[in-house]
A protein has these predicted regions:
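Solvent-exposed, charged helical/coil patches
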Residues: 1-39, 112-121
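Basic, amphipathic alpha-helical patches used to engage nucleic acids or provide basic targeting signals
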Residues: 14-20, 44-112
């Protein structure tokens, strides 16, 4: 394992163990290729960041945010970094996931249909 990866892996593990109700609700719909056969993973390190959910094949990141994220400059910087690395980013509020999971899933499916495939390396 590359230096620093242990720290990222441990942080991701802690985040998975302390998921919010909204993250758990969305994960139950994304896990096991339940959403159109797309493989999502949760609390995944990408660069210096850890994202809530990512479909690497479609380069789509899904973040579930609480009130602490309102107008966060940190989130703007994160999203800009991801976009610069050819990821698409969707953000949903916790209450949207908990109160309108169907609408959230429809949005994700719609974006997955548009998302470019993972670039060849």
């Amino acid at each position: 394992m590359r230096p620093g990866n242990e720290v990222k892996t441990e942080r991701a593990r802690r985040l998975r163990e302390n998921s919010t109700d909204a993250e758990n609700a969305l994960w139950s719909r994304l896990r096991g290729r339940r959403l159109g056969g797309h493989k999502f993973v949760r609390q995944e390190p990408i660069g210096v960041y850890t994202v809530d959910f990512v479909c690497r094949e479609s380069r789509l990141i899904v973040e579930v945010d609480g009130g602490q994220h309102a107008e966060s400059q940190t989130d703007v910087a994160r999203d800009n970094w991801f976009r610069a690395h050819n990821y698409r980013v969707l953000r949903f509020w916790n209450n949207d996931v908990l109160g309108n999971i169907g609408g959230v899933l429809e949005t994700i499916v719609s974006v997955l249909a548009e998302a470019p495939p993972h670039p060849e390396r």
